[in-house]
Design a protein with these regions (language model features):
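Active-site cores that bind ATP or allylic diphosphates and position pyrophosphate for catalysis
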Residues: 1-37, 43, 192, 196
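Basic, alpha-helical terminal appendages of large translation-related enzymes
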Residues: 138, 142-208
């Protein structure tokens, strides 16, 4: 319709309308996202798993290039957002103008020290089996001491997003192997050994 309208305008001697080239959203296979197929991820789902700012950054970059929009792209997009925020702390005015998060936040990039990437946080959710923010925060504080939660509002929101993403996306695709007899005996021995450890033992002592 853009091409046709341009031809019509030329025929009547008027100025061509300004156009904007854009591409469609694609799923992980490179196919067009369709409501009937249910492929890809919706905007609402993204906002269940990550912040609006991470989505704004993803949309901001390469507007003329087709974008893949599916569940597994979210952690990467969030980590890119965190990296740009981290870079902004040491950038001058000119460099900030080239930083997309400066535009996403209307010139007020939040200043927050990065604790860990979103991908690493997802790994922590998986290994710790944490089902709530309070428990996951305890594991985070074991990784990095002297953290005050209220000083990390962005990361605090990521803690909640990570649990939701793991339960909805990662956990549903996990397949657990049924142990054979030899593996079962080894696991039972491990459980027995861990059960005999006292509370005062350090993680290093337990592992040795």
């Amino acid at each position: 319709s853009a091409i046709l309208s341009t031809k019509i305008i030329k025929l009547i001697g008027k100025r061509n309308p300004s156009g904007f080239a854009y591409e469609l959203f694609l799923d992980e296979k490179g196919e067009k996202i369709s409501k009937s197929k249910g492929n890809g991820i919706t905007i609402e789902q993204w906002l269940d798993y990550a912040s609006p700012e991470s989505l704004s950054l993803y949309m901001y970059q390469n507007p003329k290039r087709a974008k893949k929009l599916y569940n597994e792209i979210v952690p990467k997009a969030v980590d890119e957002y965190l990296e740009f925020i981290e870079k902004a702390k040491n950038q001058d005015e000119l460099e900030l103008l080239m930083n997309p998060t400066w535009h996403v936040h209307n010139g007020n990039v939040p200043k927050e020290n990065l604790i860990m990437s979103f991908s690493m946080l997802l790994n922590l959710v998986e290994t710790s089996n944490a089902e709530n923010k309070e428990l996951l925060w305890k594991f985070v504080k074991k990784y990095k001491d002297n953290i005050i939660e209220k000083e990390h509002p962005i990361f605090d929101s990521l803690v909640g997003y990570a649990i939701k993403y793991f339960n909805d996306v990662i956990k549903t695709k996990k397949k657990y192997k049924t142990p054979n007899q030899q593996e079962k005996k080894a696991l039972e021995a491990l459980i027995k050994t861990l059960g005999s450890c006292n509370d005062k033992m350090s993680p290093e002592d337990i592992q040795t």
